[in-house]
Amino acid sequence: MALKEYKPTSPARRHMTVADFAEITKAKPEKRLTKPVRKSGGRNAHGKVTTRHIGGGHKRRYRLIDWRRDKDGVPAKVAAIEYDPNRTARIALLHYLDGEKRYILAPVGVAVGDTLLSGADVDIRPGNALPVRTIPLGTVIHNVETAPGSGAKMIRTAGSFGQLMAKEGGYAQIRLPSGEVRKVLQDCKATIGQLGNVESSSVRVGKAGKSRWLGIRPTVRGLAMNPVDHPHGGGEGKSGQGNPHPVSPWGQKTKGLKTRNNRRTDKFIVTRRRPGVRNTQR
């Protein structure tokens, strides 16, 4: 993937970059492998806004991705590399030898015509899915399960990858893109390689209208609001927030407050991610 720039015919065009989509080989998805997406506008079943800054955007169909890779031993040929509007990574259409078709996330190095496999005794090559116990230490992986058979839950963003660090006592230690080292059972499956569309994080939107195409509405600062709308609002001119600690519109402390409260899975974290480091591998 490469980024495409435009002539500076406007301030938006000057700063905008887009993916060149050179790797895409098929324009329309397999209809049987899609389903409709109903937009929520950030509202729940009662019509109340539960997630702000969501609404509008281009109409989409959801692509059904094979997260489990459970067709062990059945060869699959890569028929196409497609765009998926619901995620940053590209997706690959697989045609299995028994006639079934499935989508997977497309890793770097997988091209149309390649044959992919899943199972315990398959080759270590990009796109193949194996139990972690059969993967050599130091191998770059993605699409990692957190429980055997649950389907991939970790390392699914474009350009991301993890690394198998150690195996001990039925568990494997995997370094995640955030720098965190986490334990998973060795029977969990993972896919070999780094996910494609590597430069996705470097794309510059360029203009507000493009965010609206993506279904992202404006984010208004609390400081710019009236006191009735936000604790930071009001005052004459550009006055401060008036609070000893930044708060949300509902008065809860924000910015720097710890949000993780899942002690049940703390035992699986070997090394915490480093604060302020989003991805240490790029």
Curated annotation (Swiss-Prot):
<dbReference type="GO" id="GO:0002181">
    <property type="term" value="P:cytoplasmic translation"/>
</dbReference>
<dbReference type="GO" id="GO:0015934">
    <property type="term" value="C:large ribosomal subunit"/>
</dbReference>
<dbReference type="GO" id="GO:0003735">
    <property type="term" value="F:structural constituent of ribosome"/>
</dbReference>
<comment type="subunit">
    <text>Part of the 50S ribosomal subunit. Forms a bridge to the 30S subunit in the 70S ribosome.</text>
</comment>
<dbReference type="GO" id="GO:0016740">
    <property type="term" value="F:transferase activity"/>
</dbReference>
<feature type="compositionally biased region" description="Basic residues">
    <location>
        <begin position="270"/>
        <end position="282"/>
    </location>
</feature>
<dbReference type="InterPro" id="IPR005880">
    <property type="entry name" value="Ribosomal_uL2_bac/org-type"/>
</dbReference>
<keyword id="KW-0687">Ribonucleoprotein</keyword>
<feature type="region of interest" description="Disordered">
    <location>
        <begin position="223"/>
        <end position="282"/>
    </location>
</feature>
<feature type="region of interest" description="Disordered">
    <location>
        <begin position="31"/>
        <end position="54"/>
    </location>
</feature>
<keyword id="KW-0699">rRNA-binding</keyword>
<dbReference type="InterPro" id="IPR002171">
    <property type="entry name" value="Ribosomal_uL2"/>
</dbReference>
<keyword id="KW-0689">Ribosomal protein</keyword>
<keyword id="KW-0694">RNA-binding</keyword>
<feature type="compositionally biased region" description="Basic residues">
    <location>
        <begin position="34"/>
        <end position="54"/>
    </location>
</feature>
<dbReference type="InterPro" id="IPR014726">
    <property type="entry name" value="Ribosomal_uL2_dom3"/>
</dbReference>
<dbReference type="InterPro" id="IPR022666">
    <property type="entry name" value="Ribosomal_uL2_RNA-bd_dom"/>
</dbReference>
<dbReference type="InterPro" id="IPR012340">
    <property type="entry name" value="NA-bd_OB-fold"/>
</dbReference>
<protein>
    <recommendedName>
        <fullName>Large ribosomal subunit protein uL2</fullName>
    </recommendedName>
</protein>
<dbReference type="GO" id="GO:0019843">
    <property type="term" value="F:rRNA binding"/>
</dbReference>
<comment type="similarity">
    <text>Belongs to the universal ribosomal protein uL2 family.</text>
</comment>
<dbReference type="Pfam" id="PF00181">
    <property type="entry name" value="Ribosomal_L2"/>
</dbReference>
<dbReference type="InterPro" id="IPR008991">
    <property type="entry name" value="Translation_prot_SH3-like_sf"/>
</dbReference>
<dbReference type="Pfam" id="PF03947">
    <property type="entry name" value="Ribosomal_L2_C"/>
</dbReference>
<dbReference type="InterPro" id="IPR022669">
    <property type="entry name" value="Ribosomal_uL2_C"/>
</dbReference>
<dbReference type="InterPro" id="IPR014722">
    <property type="entry name" value="Rib_uL2_dom2"/>
</dbReference>
<comment type="function">
    <text>One of the primary rRNA binding proteins. Required for association of the 30S and 50S subunits to form the 70S ribosome, for tRNA binding and peptide bond formation. It has been suggested to have peptidyltransferase activity; this is somewhat controversial. Makes several contacts with the 16S rRNA in the 70S ribosome.</text>
</comment>
